[in-house]
């Protein structure tokens, strides 16, 4: 149990005809945040996402990296008890990927459970202390990171 911040599919919870500003409030509401809370965190969300000059542009004009940055910024504006991220570190430029990785590590250090989905074995080794290896929807192995990653690579 806990408040969950999911980032499962790029653009889910967004309206591509609305601006970035409007989508902060839409996506935040979907995640259960009040308008007042989002107003108090608005500047932080925009600053972390690094899309300030495009905040009043409709999302249909955003790159996939910009959408991912906005989604990640909204999802992590509070410390969720559970954060679900699907390939978030593979979208956007290298600087934002590193910034996102650091934010996830901070959240994990603060007690957030992160369910991290990735095909990048190096990211899995760096981010995880337990791993579930799934193949075609079936659990192949569950255990400590190095054991599972070694089996997967072997």
Each model region followed by its residue ranges:
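A short, proline-enriched helix->beta-strand linker immediately N-terminal to the Walker B motif
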Residues: 76-85
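Conserved ABC ATPase "signature" C-loop
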Residues: 136-137, 152
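ABC ATPase "signature
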Residues: 142-143
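Helical segment within the ABC ATPase nucleotide-binding domain
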Residues: 97-110
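ABC ATPase nucleotide-binding domain signature region
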Residues: 1-28
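Conserved ABC ATPase "signature" region
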Residues: 25, 37-54, 71-73
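A short, surface-exposed alpha-helical micro-motif characterized by mixed small hydrophobic
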Residues: 124-126
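H-loop/switch region of ABC-family ATPase nucleotide-binding domains
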Residues: 118-119
């Amino acid at each position: 149990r806990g408040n969950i911040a999911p980032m499962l599919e790029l653009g889910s919870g967004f309206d591509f005809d609305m601006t970035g500003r409007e989508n902060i409030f839409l996506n935040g509401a979907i995640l259960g945040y009040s308008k007042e809370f989002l107003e108090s965190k608005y500047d932080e969300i925009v600053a972390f996402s690094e899309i300030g000059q495009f905040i009043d542009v409709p999302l249909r004009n955003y790159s996939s990296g910009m959408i991912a940055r906005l989604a990640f910024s909204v999802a992590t504006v509070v410390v969720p008890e559970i954060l679900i991220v699907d390939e978030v570190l593979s979208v956007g430029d290298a600087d934002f990927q590193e910034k996102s990785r650091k934010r996830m590590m901070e959240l994990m250090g603060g007690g957030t459970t992160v369910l991290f989905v990735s095909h990048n074995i190096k990211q899995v080794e760096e981010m995880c202390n337990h791993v579930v290896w799934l193949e075609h929807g079936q659990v192949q192995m569950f255990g400590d990171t190095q054991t599972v990653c070694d089996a997967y690579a072997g």
